[in-house]
Amino acid sequence: MKLHELQPAEGSRHTRKRIGRGIGSGTGKTAGKGHKGQNARSGGGVRPGFEGGQNPLYRRLPKRGFTNISRKEFAIVSLDALNRFEEGTVVTPELLKETGVISALRDGVKVLANGELTVKLTVKAHKFSGAAAEKIAQVGGTTEVI
């Protein structure tokens, strides 16, 4: 086989369906839209969720829940992400943002116990999960709630 003999695998390529190009094409005249009716018109069809006038599902089901206006969204940091820092470093939310561990400070930083920590650090954050605080202490590090 030579480079000029390369061909796509059999059945992997399809020719484009050209509609409205004569009756010999199989999709001429009405271009696959049938005769008259709402769907045959330009811009025709029903909106998403329309069920022919029957009360649609999204209106049959009751509303649920609410949006808590005082909800706090914390930036999440996993323990294994803290391994990039040198031993003895004081890890602050500002340092985490500078180094690209988190993209935005949001309403604070929460440290979770995903992965293992191998470096002794002083970690300052707004919240710690119980397991994360335990793992930091095991390595000899300290936690400080801001």
Curated annotation (Swiss-Prot):
GO cellular component, one term: cytosolic large ribosomal subunit
Protein name as catalogued: Large ribosomal subunit protein uL15
Family: Belongs to the universal ribosomal protein uL15 family.
InterPro entries in the record: Ribosomal_uL15 (IPR030878), Ribosomal_uL15/eL18 (IPR021131), Ribosomal_uL15/eL18_sf (IPR036227), Ribosomal_uL15_bac-type (IPR005749), Ribosomal_uL15_CS (IPR001196)
Region annotation (Disordered) ranges: 1-58
Gene3D superfamilies given in the database record: 3.100.10.10
The keyword Transcription regulation belongs to this UniProt entry's keyword annotation: no
Domain of life: Bacteria
Entry GO MF terms: rRNA binding; structural constituent of ribosome
GO biological process: translation
Biased composition, class Gly residues, residue ranges: 21-31, 42-52
HAMAP family, sorted: Ribosomal_uL15 (MF_01341)
